[in-house]
Swiss-Prot record:
GO (cellular component) term, any one: ribonucleoprotein complex
Species: Rhodococcus opacus (strain B4)
Name listed for the protein in its UniProt record: Large ribosomal subunit protein bL31B
SUPFAM superfamilies to which the protein is assigned, alphabetical: L28p-like
Keyword Chaperone among record annotations: no
Family designation: Belongs to the bacterial ribosomal protein bL31 family. Type B subfamily.
Any Pfam family matching the protein: Ribosomal_L31
Subunit field text: Part of the 50S ribosomal subunit.
Gene3D superfamilies membership: Ribosomal protein L31
PANTHER family given in the database record: 50S RIBOSOMAL PROTEIN L31, CHLOROPLASTIC, LARGE RIBOSOMAL SUBUNIT PROTEIN BL31C
Cross-referenced HAMAP family: Ribosomal_bL31_2
């Protein structure tokens, strides 16, 4: 690999916003927020909406996402279209 052209690849803690589950992995993402991991070290914290802990494919359970508000907002903005 050429030096100086690749982003920094470092340990990062990802947190599932809906379950609170945290994962320590490596990524090029950075964040101003930090978290202290089980090993006592401080790592950047990235909060994500969906992980394998909350996605219906991996959990096998249906989870209601907050799409009702988005649909209503879309209908208010563009109106409800009637089919012929």
């Amino acid at each position: 690999m050429k030096p100086g052209i690749h982003p920094d690849y470092h340990p990062v803690v990802f947190q599932d916003a809906s379950t609170g589950t945290t994962f320590l992995t490596r990524s090029t993402l950075t964040s101003d927020r930090t978290a202290v991991w089980e090993d006592g070290n401080t790592y950047p914290l990235v909060v994500v909406d969906v992980t394998s802990e909350s996605h219906p494919f991996w959990t096998g359970a249906q989870r209601v996402m907050d799409t009702a508000g988005r649909v209503e907002k879309f209908e208010r903005r563009y109106g409800v279209r009637k089919r012929p």
